[in-house]
Structures are given as C-alpha cells and as structure tokens.
C-alpha cells in the first residue's frame, strides 16, 4: 500500500484535483466529500463486510471507493464523467478488487453488469452512493425497479429528500416517493452530514439513508405495481386539493365514473375530502384495487 494520505482527507483531495487539473462539474452534481470520519461512518452504516459485492454510484475521485475497498469483497464503481476514469484508475491502483467503469447507472443493465463484472456474483450485492441531488429520485426508482435483490442501499442525499423517504402519513414530507420506497424497503436516516465537509460546499446539508428489504410482507397486493404508482403519483399531483379532486383529475369527471368512485370510497370508509397524504400505502393499494374492479383504472 502507498504511504500517501487517504483520498478522503482534504489535503489529498486538493492534491489530486491540482495534479489532474480537476474542476468539479455542476452538470454532474459533483461535490467531493473530504471528511474521513464521515466516509468511514458511511461504510459502517451500509454494514459492508468482506463477503459483500458493492456497487458504488458516482465515485468522484475515489474517496469513498477507497474506504469500501478496505471493507468489501469486491467494489464496482460506476462513474458517468469520462474525465475522472483515468484519475480513479490511478489513485485506486493499490486495490486489486476495485473495478472502475464509465457508466451512467440509469442506462445500465444492472443484472448483466453484476454477472459480468464481479468475480463472484452470488455474494450479497449492496449499493453505496453519494448521489447528485438533482437525480436522486430517478436513480432510487431505477434501483428499485431492477430485478436485482439488493441486500442494502446506502445513499447520501439532500437532507430534505431523506426526510421525504422516511416520512409518516399526515406529514408534509409524505408523498409518492415515500410510498414507492415503503413498498419494497424499510428506510432509516443513519446520520446527517454538514455541507461544510464537501469541496465545493453545496447549498444544503445532507443525510445518509439506509434502505433494507421489507421483513414483513404487505397485507394486500396491488393488481398491478406500475399502475398503482402511476395512480399514487396522480393522487399527489395537487397536494393542497382533496383526494376527491385528485381522483377526478386521474379518472375523469364523467357522472357514471363519479358514481362508481363515490361507491368505492364509501365501501372503503375513506372520506372524499381527505388529503392524499393522510392515506397509508395499504389504503392506496386497496383503493387502486377497488377502482380497478370498477374498470376505472
């Protein structure tokens, strides 16, 4: 191993940026983390062991990658910025079980990538990422839509988004994203991260969120998962409006349809005037199923 300071130290980060002439790119939402304690705490929160395969999304200059390499069996780092690939390959060269590829995770065939790039694809697959704020939700949705069974997804994100992921019904943060996560995973905020530990410093603080597969199955299953979440997004399209007004936007104002919607709400004992954020995931599934039975969805 090299005697150089760890990549995540502020001095080494600045040295790497100077050596390679790196300027962070706003278009990729780049902010480099420069606090070794935070980096080590992320690895701990993700519960990385030598038996794990880790996919890291957006390694930047390799600060978190280095910490993951010291704990995991293998690390596959997906970096969208082609200019950083030679930098990563050089600074991470002391680690044999790290592979860096130029890849947009949203365009990746994740099952194929796992099969092709890991020496032992049968080991638990964990995702660890410092996600660009502007694309956090699409990346999370992409991971959850994948057929891969993730052992853990541990991501750094804007604190406000983290609060939405872990929100409870009836709160202003609760919404379609909360429900999409809850459908498959259990979410918890591991710890907050100050904006001051990044180069350059972002405008907001961050939080580390850990997602693990649900241990208790949903008591009711949707007639169609994709249609369920299209329906839920429609119900949250106008948050200040009642469920009834949102339902009319989703289903229409045809008198026959309105009569069926009224009957369904009565049957499920849901007030038409309730706000969508008051409904639980189970209630949304029951409502979608009942509307489907009436040929409204």
From Swiss-Prot:
Known role: Specifically dimethylates two adjacent adenosines (A1518 and A1519) in the loop of a conserved hairpin near the 3'-end of 16S rRNA in the 30S particle. May play a critical role in biogenesis of 30S subunits.
Binding site for S-adenosyl-L-methionine: 31, 33, 58, 79, 104, 130
Pfam families with a match to the protein in the record: RrnaAD (PF00398)
Official protein name in the record: Ribosomal RNA small subunit methyltransferase A
Gene Ontology cellular component list: cytosol
Catalysed reactions, semicolon-separated: adenosine(1518)/adenosine(1519) in 16S rRNA + 4 S-adenosyl-L-methionine = N(6)-dimethyladenosine(1518)/N(6)-dimethyladenosine(1519) in 16S rRNA + 4 S-adenosyl-L-homocysteine + 4 H(+)
CDD domains attached to this UniProt entry: AdoMet_MTases (cd02440)
EC annotation from Swiss-Prot or TrEMBL: 2.1.1.182
Family to which the UniProt record says this protein belongs: Belongs to the class I-like SAM-binding methyltransferase superfamily. rRNA adenine N(6)-methyltransferase family. RsmA subfamily.
EC top class named in words: transferase
Designated gene of the protein: rsmA
Keyword rRNA processing: yes
Xref: PROSITE patterns: RRNA_A_DIMETH (PS01131), SAM_RNA_A_N6_MT (PS51689)
Annotated GO MF terms: 16S rRNA (adenine(1518)-N(6)/adenine(1519)-N(6))-dimethyltransferase activity; RNA binding
Keywords carried by this UniProt record: Cytoplasm, Methyltransferase, RNA-binding, rRNA processing, S-adenosyl-L-methionine, Transferase
Location relative to the cell: Cytoplasm
Range of residues in the leader sequence: none
SMART domains (alphabetical): rADc (SM00650)
